[in-house]
Every structure is written in structure tokens, then in C-alpha cells.
């Protein structure tokens, strides 16, 4: 592949220890690299796939997971969105209902509340309300963690895990 990030990842170690010695953090394949590879593979195999969110194209999204995709994808498949969590998730729902597959990102888990209706009532329920005639192939990526302040460090996983129709996945 001619993608510069793919070439750089080919040189990284997929193990943290080689010959009993720890590999430098800069030389180890990271979780964000796995997200990049999985997304690139899906983009190559599914022409309906799109990805968007705040700063996804320009900065690579949260933790630079999408950095390098700009070299492989046209703007209409990977793009920046306005700062409107409800619009991000709402348009993903609409796109999925029309047969597309969306990989959308909210910068922080805390902002899921800004898209509450779209996540908890639309995204989670359309498939079951249609007796599985409609599918909702949407992946919503959010950052969960600490060190970003009181309104950027919450973990809503327990709440989301109790909503029928949603799945929570962690590395």
C-alpha cells in the first residue's frame, strides 16, 4: 500500500517485549493503530462506509485514529462535522436507515448527553421497532478517560450498557 501511515505501521512491533526486552512505546503498535487498520480495511471493502466527527479529517479525530486516512479517502467518505453531537448521531441514524454504514465520533463520552435522544431512542431502537427489517450499522466512538477535566472525563458505559439495542465495546 502506498499510504504513508500503512508503511509506518508495517515497521512497528506488534509485541511489547522482544527477546525479553521491552520495546520503546514509539515503536509498538498501539490501539489507535488497530482502529486505523480496521477502519481502512472496512473502507476498502464497504463502499457505503463513511466516518465523521469533530476534526476527524483535519486532525485525525480523538487520539489521531484516523490520521492517514485522508491520503486514501475522498472527502465525502471522511469529513469534519460541526460541533453538534445531536447532528452527528442523528445524521448517522438517517444514513444507516438509508442503507449506509457510519463510523461517527463524539470527542468525549461526556457529550453523549447532548445526543441523548438520537442515541438512546433512535439509534438503539429502530432495528427492533422494525422487527429487524431495518438495520442500524452505526459505530459510535467516544473517548473515555481521565485527565481532561470534570466535563471531559466521565464514563457512561454502565448507563449505555443498560439500553436495549446498544453494545459497549472496550479494548
Per-range role (PLM):
Residues 2-171:
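Thiamine diphosphate
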Amino acid at each position: 500500500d502506498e499510504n504513508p501511515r500503512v508503511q509506518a505501521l508495517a515497521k512497528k512491533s506488534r509485541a511489547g517485549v522482544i527477546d525479553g526486552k521491552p520495546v520503546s512505546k514509539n515503536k509498538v503498535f498501539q490501539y489507535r493503530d488497530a482502529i486505523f487498520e480496521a477502519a481502512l480495511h472496512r473502507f476498502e471493502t464497504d463502499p457505503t462506509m463513511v466516518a465523521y466527527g469533530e476534526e476527524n479529517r483535519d486532525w485525525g479525530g480523538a487520539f489521531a485514529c484516523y490520521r492517514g486516512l485522508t491520503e486514501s479517502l475522498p472527502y465525502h467518505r471522511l469529513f469534519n462535522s460541526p460541533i453538534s453531537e445531536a447532528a452527528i448521531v442523528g445524521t448517522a441514524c438517517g444514513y444507516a436507515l438509508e442503507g449506509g454504514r457510519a463510523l461517527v465520533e463524539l470527542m468525549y463520552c461526556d457529550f453523549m448527553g447532548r445526543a441523548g435522544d438520537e442515541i438512546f431512542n433512535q439509534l438503539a431502537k429502530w432495528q427492533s421497532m422494525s422487527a429487524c427489517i431495518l438495520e442500524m450499522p452505526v459505530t459510535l466512538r467516544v473517548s473515555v478517560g481521565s485527565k481532561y477535566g470534570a466535563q471531559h472525563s466521565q464514563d457512561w458505559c454502565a448507563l449505555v450498557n443498560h439500553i436495549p439495542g446498544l453494545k459497549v465495546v472496550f479494548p
